[in-house]
Amino acid sequence: MIAMNTPDFQRMKKDNKKISMVTCYDYWSACIISQSNVDCILVGDSLAMVMYGHSTTLPATVEIMAQHIQAVSRGAPNKFIIGDMPFCSYRKDLTTSMNAVERLMQAGAQAIKLEGADAHNLKFIHHVVKSGIPVIGHLGLTPQSIYTLGGFKVQGKEPSAAKKLMADAKALAETGCFAVVLECVPSELAELITHSISIPTIGIGAGPATSGQVLVLQDLLGTNNQFQPKYLKKFLNGFELIKKALDDFDQEVKTSTYPHLETHCY
């Protein structure tokens, strides 16, 4: 049984209880998260970068997303799972876009997330919500628009940009989103948005005042020693710990210490 549902997001904001979200892509790590206190899981299109080594999220497809959602849902059947709508999957005709939503939901998602709040997106979100499917919005640094934004940069610094982000957040709430991700926006702006809309905000690089926080699992575990954006706290030195385990294995194999005849052999 899933421990969390969409009304819980609203309740937690009302009760001033922070929401924890982790981005996860595979079965084995989902199994670990399923035993943790983390509230919910995002299967993000960032898997194109983290799992496949691409430089952007754009190569993620609906089918790739569905496969990873299936794996995560099998590993963490007790967690609320959000599936990312990948690049351009919701910018096509309504039937094609809804087929993409259907694929992700049938793969095991309980909600979908999509980036931006232009007129096209708002109309589509309205249709999806009216179809009984929960939607999370995503504002600020929207990686699918990376070439338009000019890189991975903080958004909303200028007054006009901040005003637009506020208007977009209000529009997403009014259209029926049950939460919105705020990525790489000034903390004061994120706080103002959080207090100005009825739905929870989930921050990544958006300061402490948002309704919750999301980090990629591999990032918070510190598995990439080359990746250190300002917003990231590494809760584990995973790179060094994993490397040491591999080196210890290598040494024990080469010195015939492993496998031990009495302990590891049949």
Swiss-Prot record:
The active site is at residue 183. The keyword Amino-acid biosynthesis does not apply. Binds 1 Mg(2+) ion per subunit. GO terms for biological process: pantothenate biosynthetic process. Mg(2+) binds at residues 45, 84, 115. InterPro entries: Pantoate_hydroxy_MeTrfase, Pyrv/PenolPyrv_kinase-like_dom, Pyrv_kinase-like_dom_sf. 3-methyl-2-oxobutanoate binds at residues 45-46, 84, 113. It is found in: Cytoplasm. Pfam families: Pantoate_transf. Its EC number is 2.1.2.11. Keywords: Cytoplasm, Magnesium, Metal-binding, Pantothenate biosynthesis, Transferase. The keyword RNA-binding does not apply. CDD domains: KPHMT-like. Pathway: Cofactor biosynthesis; (R)-pantothenate biosynthesis; (R)-pantoate from 3-methyl-2-oxobutanoate: step 1/2. It catalyses: 3-methyl-2-oxobutanoate + (6R)-5,10-methylene-5,6,7,8-tetrahydrofolate + H2O = 2-dehydropantoate + (6S)-5,6,7,8-tetrahydrofolate. One of its GO terms (molecular function) is 3-methyl-2-oxobutanoate hydroxymethyltransferase activity. Its cofactor is Mg(2+). PANTHER family: 3-METHYL-2-OXOBUTANOATE HYDROXYMETHYLTRANSFERASE (PTHR20881:SF0). Belongs to the PanB family. Homodecamer; pentamer of dimers. Catalyzes the reversible reaction in which hydroxymethyl group from 5,10-methylenetetrahydrofolate is transferred onto alpha-ketoisovalerate to form ketopantoate. This is 3-methyl-2-oxobutanoate hydroxymethyltransferase. It comes from Coxiella burnetii (strain RSA 493 / Nine Mile phase I). The gene is panB.
